[in-house]
Amino acid sequence: MTSQFAAELCELLVEENFGELFGRIFATLSRYDRLNLPRLKAYSELPNRQLLPALAAMIQQHLVYHYTSYDDGVTYYEANMQSAYYLVRSGKILEFVEERLGKYAATVLSTIMYLGHAQVSYLETLPELTSEAVKANGVPEEHGEHEEDEEQSNGLNGEHSNEQPELLHPTLKALAAHGYIIRVREAQFQSHADNILDAERAIRSKPEMKALKGKRLEEAVIEGTLGLLKERTDGDLTRGLIVHGVPRGAKRKHSSRRADEPNKKCRTDFASVDENDEHDEEEENEWSDDEMGYDTTPMEVSARELYATVSERETEQGVSPATAKVYECLLRRIEYQTHQCRDTAEIPREGEEGEQYSVPIALSALAEDVNPQLDLSSSTGPMDSSQPDGRRGKRPWDGDVEGTNHEEANGLSSGGSGGNRTFEIDQHLSLLAQPPHNLTSKRMVSGLITWTVEFRHLARKLRHLELERMIEARYGDVALRVVRVLHAKGKLDEKRLQEISLLPFKDLRQVLASMQAGGFVDLQEVPRDAQRQPSRTIYLWYYDPDRICNSVLQDTYKAMSRCLQRLRFERSRIKDFLEKTERSDVKGNEQRFLSEPELVLLEQWRAKEALLLGEVARLDEMVAVMRDY
């Protein structure tokens, strides 16, 4: 992340969101890396009356790390590149929250993002989160898409709108259950390297470590450091908020209950949690300070990217829309129970990454999530006599005890139609588990059918698809064929590559030369003797996905920074006009206060701004594929 173009992009994002003062301090820290207060003051050329309040605000926004040394007592400051980059995803995160939890939840999260971190008691006093503001925004209507029992449990149906905490606290717990907010810990204000050094120092000072020596000491220190580091930085608030693998307050798009079930349920979701927490001091301390958590966001983006990949294959490789919807339900279940895409900070190199499977999801749980109105049978082949519902042509039995037990033993739901539908869902997932998709994996856990995905395989597939899409757009389908051959076979000389790809030598050489100039393929020279004569040298072409991903990532950072710079330039050209349109009396009344040419100029500016910001968002999706998954 700490490259020239990444630092430039983060500086632009900070200045775009927080102003020139924050941008100047952040640029100084990113340029000189780690500074104490006197040096920061000298390099930034700012007085104390501006520097100190700005530093405090940037620490509040998690844009700057601070660490006080145990040796000399000097406090050092360091730029937080990761939090600065995630400013570009704030709108996408709020869109996710509004889609899943409603408009009021998005407002609460937006307030926490604006404050950096905040106490719950302070959030209760904010006017934009009061019941009057909620009524004005129409939140009860927004949450009308929930099931009735979820509306009752979340308290978002307007029944308790006279007391604002009754609406705020369930919303905070819903955000915590989804992983959007976390508990503030002191170690989160320090860099990862400083936290490791502090944890290692604390582990080595323990009395039991003095009796160990050599390799055993180093292993014990590493194990203890990782455990202490996880304990200090863990801000998870999902304890007690995940029920049967689904967060409380999750928004459902359909009702899966049967007609004979009661239409209402007891209000036990958040009411029981609040009653149990009233006298629990530890739980109250947990919820005293909250902040925005970005760790789960790549998981959501990854799930959406995988669903988009399956949807694109509907016409290419015969994947039906129903199969894509079933896969979306599986990814949603996995996303609820997974906090991070991977355990390590860096993406392991290809060939060195081990298997990392997600949590297994029971087939019966997926049957509850899939929309009952979704047609699953029309896109699969007919069932034969060996399938669970094998009594085709016969009248179904009403009291089939043996058949019911047989279905339940295999993880299928009881009942005729339920068993058929569960089997159809299993068939759709089995289709995705077969080549060339390889997107799912079937397992038996305690005699029940479960489905899982392999994270590293899917992340690698997404990266390869993105690179192949880019190569095909730049160099054509012939280059794509050559790259696929090199990726499958490894290093090849020109003659062997021509035999496998079935291309003329002239076309092959042109494609290889153009891709080598673009950095997508490279040439390795293997001399046969010590003289290194060209006639006695073997030239091998190869394709390195890791190197290309890193190069594409840097180019993406550069393109994003250029888009933001262009946006700033276009804004400066019509600065006076934009200041006029942003006045409180003009905003919302443009037709009344602006002339016809000014309205045309405003429309052109909004279209240009949407184009540039949309391009930045699209490039951010590429960054997520190349860096975060």
Swiss-Prot record:
Comp. bias intervals (Polar residues): 374-388
Location relative to the cell: Nucleus
GO MF annotation list: single-stranded DNA binding
One Pfam family it belongs to: HTH_9
SUPFAM superfamilies listed in its UniProt record: Winged helix' DNA-binding domain
Cellular component GO terms, alphabetical: RNA polymerase III complex
This protein's name: DNA-directed RNA polymerase III subunit rpc3
Organism of origin: Aspergillus fumigatus (strain ATCC MYA-4609 / CBS 101355 / FGSC A1100 / Af293) (Neosartorya fumigata)
